[in-house]
Amino acid sequence: MKIDKKSNSLIKRRELLKKTAAMSAFLVVPRHVLGGSAHIAPSDRINIAAVGVGGRGRSNIQSCANENIYALCDIDDGKVAETLGEDWAAPFVGKTKLYRDYREMLENEPEIDALIISTPDHMHTPIAASAMDLGKHLYIEKPLCHTVAEARFLARRARETNIVSQMGNQGHAEEGGRLINEWVADGALGAVQEVHCWTNRPVWPQGIGRPAGSDPIPSTLDWDLWVGAAPFRPYLKDRYHAFNWRGWMDFGTGVVGDMGAHIIDHPYWALDLDLPTKVSASSSRFGANLETFPLASKIHFEFPVKGSRPPVKLTWYDGGLMPERPEILEQERMMGDRDGGVLIVGDKNTLMHGVYGRDPRIIPETNHSDYQKPAPTIARSPGIHQEWIDAIKDRSKMTTSHFEYSGQLSETMLLGNIATVRASENKVLEYDGANMRFTNDDGANTLLDKDYRAGYGLV
C-alpha cells in the first residue's frame, strides 16, 4: 500500500483507541472516548457527520435524518446551502456544525459516532482511513473505493477497528435481491455458468482528453480540497465538479465502478462468486493519455468452481453495448429496464432482472408462473441506511453490504477497469486473488494501487 506518513496524530489516536478499548471492560467511559464503536442505546440518536453533501450525499443524509445530523463537511459551500435549504433539513439549520476540511472536523468533533462519505470516488478511502482510526462507523456511497488495494485496506481496517460498515448500493437491501438469492438456491435455474450484465451509462463525458487552460475558481469552492488525494490539476468549469468526475481516471471508476455495484451485485451475491481468476476486455478508444475511461466497453470475468457450483463467466456491457436478446423472451417485453439489466442463464431456466435487482422474473413468463416459489429464507431488510443505523445501536445485528462483501465486489469491478486499460495487450489477465497480483502482466500490477498527494495518505 502506497501510504503517506505525514500525519502522526491519527497513528497516536489509533494506539489510544486500542488501549481505551482494552480498558473499557473495567471502566464506564463516555462514548466519544471510544469513538463510534462504543455502545449506543437503541433509544439514543446517533451523532452522524456527512462528508460530501450534494447529489447522493444529500439523499444519504435525508435517509438518516431521524438521527442527529451533527456535522456537514463539503468543499463547496453552495452544496451545503442547498442541502440545508431542504424542508427535511430544517431541524438541523443553525445546529449542525459546518466544515470544509474533513480532517479538521474529525480533529475537532470527538462526539461524532458515524460518518457518511459521498465524495468523488478518489477520496472515499483517505477519509475512511482517518475516521476508522477514531472508531467511527462508516457508510460509504458506492463504489466503495478507487483501487484494488483500497478495497483490501477498507475490509482489513474495518475488522481491526470493529466498526459497523456499509456500502451504499441500496438495491442490495431491496426485496428483489433476496428473491434472486432464494430462487437460485432453490435450484430454479439449475446449474448457472453464464451471466450477462449491462447498463445505459455513461451519461457523463468519457473517451476525451484533458482540455488546456483553467477557469476562475468560484468563491464558494475550495478546489485544492476537492482535488484532494489526486495529482493537482487546474479548475475547469463543469469539467469535473460536481458530476462529471465519474469518467476521469484520477477521480472516478468509470461505468463499471459506478453501476456495477447496482447491477453485478445480485448475481455476484446469489452465486457466491468471490474473485475472478481471469479478466479480459475490449473497448472503444480511451481519452488521450488514458485520462478518461472509454465510451463503451465489454468485460469478461471468469470465476472458478466453488463447491457444487460450476465455473461462471460473467460479461459486462456498457456504452450502448448489450448481450444478444434471448429467443425465449417475449417480443413485447423489454430486456431488463431502461437503465440496464441482468440475465442469469442456467441449464433449466433463465432469470432476468432490472437495475438494483428489481422485478426479477424467470423467462418466459409461463415458466415464471409455473415455478413454485420457496418460502423466504433470507431476512428482509429495513433499507440500506436503516440496516446500518440498527447495527450501530445493536451490535448483534449485521449489515449486508459490509466492507468484507462490498470490498470483494468492488475489487472485482476494479479488476475489470484494469483489464480495459490493458486491453491493447490482447491478453486474458490471470489473477491470483490470494496474493493480490496478476501472474502474467506486470504492467497490470502497477494499476492495483496508486500514490497519494501529501496529507491524504492512508495512515
For the regions a language model picked out, list residue spans one by one.
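Short, solvent-exposed turn/loop segments enriched in Gly/Ser/Thr/Pro and often Arg
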Residues: 99, 118-123, 144-146, 151, ...
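N-terminal glycine-/serine-/threonine-rich beta1-alpha1-beta2 phosphate-ribose binding loop
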Residues: 2-137, 149-164
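Structural recognition of the beta-strand scaffold that forms the well-ordered cores
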Residues: 47-51, 70-74, 116-117, 139-140, ...
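Short, solvent-exposed loop/turn elements at domain surfaces
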Residues: 56-60, 80-82, 108, 204-206, ...
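Glycine-rich, aromatic-lined ligand/substrate-binding cores of catalytic
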Residues: 219-399, 410-434, 438
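Non-transmembrane alpha-helical segments in soluble domains
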Residues: 17, 61, 81-84, 103-106, ...
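A contiguous active-site-proximal alpha/beta segment in oxidoreductase catalytic domains
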Residues: 137-139, 145-220, 225
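C-terminal helix-rich "cap/oligomerization" subdomain common to oxidoreductases
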Residues: 2, 18-41, 292, 391-459
